[in-house]
Design a protein with these regions (language model features):
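Conserved, well-structured interaction surfaces
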Residues: 32, 70-144, 159-164, 176-177, ...
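Membrane-proximal, proline-rich intrinsically disordered regions
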Residues: 6-57
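Short coil/turn linking the two alpha-helices of tandem helical-hairpin repeats
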Residues: 139-149, 187, 218-221
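Aromatic- and glycine-enriched pocket-lining scaffold segments that form the walls
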Residues: 194-239
Length: 266
């Protein structure tokens, strides 16, 4: 007598997914998923971030009877001090580094993929990831400032050191400049869709240079700031709506704009 049975194909655990499959030979669809995840994640905890930097910067006053820390801690009421382990610090910190993780995964995936993309598209895609990564690290820096930030976080089991303020800015500028070199003169489209300004590498370069100009100002490198601005989307005679945006919607499963409040809302 003999017995036969169906073969069982191995299935990845959906509750504990691994990045190894994506980083070793990602499909175009998987590359797109990484981009969607990064751009969706860029919107997380923006309310905490902008409440923090805006209230401390005296750009607005946050009326919220549910949490006195928004005026107490952030405005230094009485003897109040900023808390290094509360929502206005840890939430945006974690959210930004999650996107950095996505960007690092995308870079590795693009380096190793055997999908039908050109070398120019591969370079442009990596430049996109580096630009997004620099944007997120700059937001972390804006809240940490003199504390400095970690730049090297590619290996979660062996994190790089916290850099000084100047070292952090220099590292972010270098990241943007590396991306710029791979975008400049690269007349291709990314091998994925993006909501960030343009899918064309030469157009996306303008976003990269806008960020580079901002970092250059922080570094007091006025010459680089002016040069970068001239290569960005800035146009003194252009439309005030030209630029790069976060996208929100009321569709199921998507996010509403967390810093929009209807007029006269209590």
């Amino acid at each position: 007598l003999g017995w036969s049975a169906c073969t069982v194909d191995p299935v990845a655990d959906p509750n504990n997914p691994s990045t190894s499959g994506i980083t070793q030979n990602a499909t175009i669809g998987e590359l797109q998923n990484l981009v969607v995840g990064a751009e969706a994640g860029m919107r997380n905890s923006l309310n905490n971030y902008y409440d923090g930097v805006s209230v401390i910067g005296r750009e607005y006053y946050r009326f919220a009877t549910s949490d006195p820390r928004l005026t107490g801690d952030l405005l230094g009421k009485g003897s109040a001090m900023l808390d290094n382990n509360t929502f206005y610090t840890t939430n945006p910190f974690n959210a930004r580094y999650r996107v950095v993780k996505n960007a690092n995964t995308l870079i590795t995936a693009l380096q190793n993929t055997k999908a039908a993309i050109t070398d120019g598209q591969r370079k442009a895609g990596i430049a996109y990831a580096k630009t997004v990564k620099a944007h997120e690290l700059l937001m972390v820096f804006n809240q940490q400032y003199e504390n400095g930030i970690r730049i090297d976080v590619d290996d979660p089991d062996k994190l790089g050191p916290f850099l000084s303020k100047d070292e952090s800015l220099n590292a972010i500028q270098n990241l943007l400049n590396e991306a710029y070199l791979d975008l400049k003169g690269n007349d291709v489209e990314f091998p994925f869709a993006t909501t960030l300004y343009s899918k064309k590498a030469l157009e996306f370069l303008k976003f990269n240079r806008a960020l580079a100009a901002r970092v250059a100002v922080f570094r007091k490198d006025w010459a680089l700031a002016l040069t970068a601005l001239n290569e960005s989307f800035l146009d003194l005679n252009g439309s005030l709506t030209d630029g790069v945006y976060y996208l929100f919607s009321t569709q199921g499963g998507d996010l509403l704009n967390p810093i929009f409040f209807p007029q006269d809302t209590p």
